[in-house]
Every structure is written in structure tokens, then in C-alpha cells.
Amino acid sequence: MKDKVGRIAVIGATGGIGAALSDNLMELFSSATLLAVGRSVPSREKTVGQKAPVCIGGFDLLDEESIHDTCSRIVADGMPDLVFVATGILHDGDAFPERSIKDLDRQAMEHLLAVNLVGPSLIMKHLLTHVPRKGAFRMGLLSARVGSISDNQLGGWYSYRTSKAGLNMMIKGAAIELKRRNRDAILVGLHPGTVESALSEPFQRNVPPHKLFTPEHSARCLVEVLLSRSPDQSGLCFDWAGKEIEP
């Protein structure tokens, strides 16, 4: 796969994991063209022998017109061989994950679903129709273990769990449709683990130190997982170690 990667897109390249993915992929595929997509994407310094990323700013995950326009820019010079969608939120502002169903708030829930489910689904809508009918193609979207219905033994976190469970179903359905277009294409969900960030800080207390990852470590793992998947695994969800997460 490494020798065949000429174009890469990282959507959500301004976030901690997205930025780390961009850095890792530029190092791994130094001759490839990397498209770094975000609301505002800072320029990055390139190392010797390494291309600078092509930055695509002004991306709004909550606006389908923006998603359509951005996807059109991504495929303008050819469909990428490798795509990561590194978008998503756990909480926003004062809206923390619900401990009880009594904590549900319509506005907060709709926002979380818009960011974690609707936005990534529309990215798939506007990108997957450009996948070539032959040849390798890989796409991974950030999901989460808590989106697994069978794994839910604690309850709570209603909106976040629901948004990720819905995303996993969208990935499964889109992968089935994509296989009819290109039998070698791979589309999967990826669980990055608990990553050190301002958003995860309130929930790090009970996380064992060896399971609290830096963005760089998580990114390296996710790249390895996506590159090692086979077409018969398309539509599934995997954690950072490559272990399948049951629905």
C-alpha cells in the first residue's frame, strides 16, 4: 500500500489527533501530496525531502454546502488513495456527557449529533461517489468504543454514545454500497483510545497511565491499523490496536 499512495486527505487536521495524523502521514509518505483540511489550517514546516501539505481552510462541518465545496476541492486533482476523517467532539462548552437520561438537553444533543454523525456522513456522501471503480482506496473515520451497543454496560453518555453508534451504522451501510462500486475499497471506523487533550482532561482520572495516549502515539497506531485492513474488513470498527469493536 505504501508505494501506491500518491494523495492523502486528512479532514479535521487542526485537532490534536488530526494534526498528529498529518505529521505521521507526511513522514511515512514523504513523496505524497497531503491535503490538510480544517476550519483554519496553519502552515507547517516541511523537513528535508518532504513536501509541504496543501492546506484547505474554511471547512465547516455543520454546513453541507461547505462540505460539498471542500470535497470538490479534495478530488479536483484526483481522488486521494487514503482519507482520514478526524472530526468529532465529546462535549462542548458547558454541555458535558449526561450521567442520567434526565440530563438530556435537546440543543446540546442536536449539536453533538450534527458534529459526530451528520457531518461525517455528509463527507462520505460527497467523497465516496468519486472513488475509482478499480484500485486500492482506504478511508477511516474516528469513532469510539462507547458507540458499541453490546459493549455498553455502564449507561450514561447518551448523546455521545448515540452519535457514535449512528456513525458506525452509517459506515457499515456506506461500506456495503462502496463495495458494489469498488470491491477493493476499504471504509472503517477507528477508535483512537483516550487521548490527552483539553476535551478529555475531565475524564482522565480513572484512565490507567498506559492507556492515556499522546496524539502522536494514537495517530501512529491508527495509521498502522488502517493500512493493515483488508477489503473483507470494510464496514467494521477497530480500536488503536487493530482489535475489532463489536456493534
Regions found by a protein language model. Give the residues of each.
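A short helix-coil junction within the Rossmann-fold of NAD(P)-dependent oxidoreductases
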Residues: 28, 78, 126-135, 181
